[in-house]
Amino acid sequence: NNVETYANVPKIILQGADWFRTIGTEGSPGTKTFSLTGSIENTGLIEVPMGTTLRHIIYDIGGGLKSGAAFKGVQIGGPSGGCLILDQLDAPLDFDSVKKLDAIMGSGGLVVMDENTCMVEVARFFMNFTQRESCGKCVPCREGTKRMLEILERIVDGKGEMSDLDELEELANMVQNMALCGLGKSAPLPVISTLKRFRDEYEEHIRDKKCRAKVCTALRQFHINPEFCIGCGKCAKNCPAGAISGKIKHLSLIHISEPTRLLSIS
């Protein structure tokens, strides 16, 4: 059990189980503490009755997204949690409802994401965490998460293939069904949920070598705008990859190649 479980015990002892069941839902009585974070105005720890909707938490308690940004998704349940989308904001947050959405209540993490978030990178980030946290006892978790992470890293580096998506799904199902413990069984959820709800972003990374959120640096391409180039030559002089050529008072050109794509230039 965790601290949240123990915190409920004194009140149940003092006021009884019947009182406790007046809060929340029939299948998930009581309250739940969430850590509200991400692209949201009001962050912090909140305690709400089980069955409260994500919409109420994000917009009424959290104050909506920062600077009026467009909502893209919310990751629920901690590092092994699933990602939900706009159509699922009215789903009640209780154990049964969340499980049906390929997510978990988990540690109560709620990470709100806007349109500037790359969902492929989100999956890679959390898979990196769960892979490092694997105890290594069972092969499905130890090797399965490692292989999934390798594929995700290849995709965000612009080296993915369409067949990788089928392999990711197969590995995710294998780890989920064959891992020995709860961490291993839930580890693939970020990948399963993002593949299901943001598959187009995966395909863009692979097919078009494009990250719509401009987060994956390996997929950034740089161009010189002829309307603003004055032919000063400073860009060519300062380019660490030596990928810019041109004469003074003439338009400079960027030679698109692997080194150029890897530069973290805004």
Language-model regions, residue ranges each:
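Short amphipathic, charge-patterned alpha-helical segments
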Residues: 51-66
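Solvent-exposed alpha-helices and their adjacent loops that cap or buttress functional pockets
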Residues: 1, 25-28, 38-40, 66-68, ...
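Single conserved hydrophobic/aromatic residue that forms the stacking wall/gate
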Residues: 254-265
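Cysteine-centered loop/knuckle micro-motif
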Residues: 238-239, 264-266
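C-type cytochrome heme c attachment motif
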Residues: 231-238
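Ferredoxin-type iron-sulfur electron-transfer modules in oxidoreductases and energy-metabolism complexes
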Residues: 92-226, 242-252
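Hydrophobic alpha-helical positions that pack around
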Residues: 1-50, 62
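Terminal amphipathic helices with adjacent charged low-complexity linkers/tails
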Residues: 66-95, 196
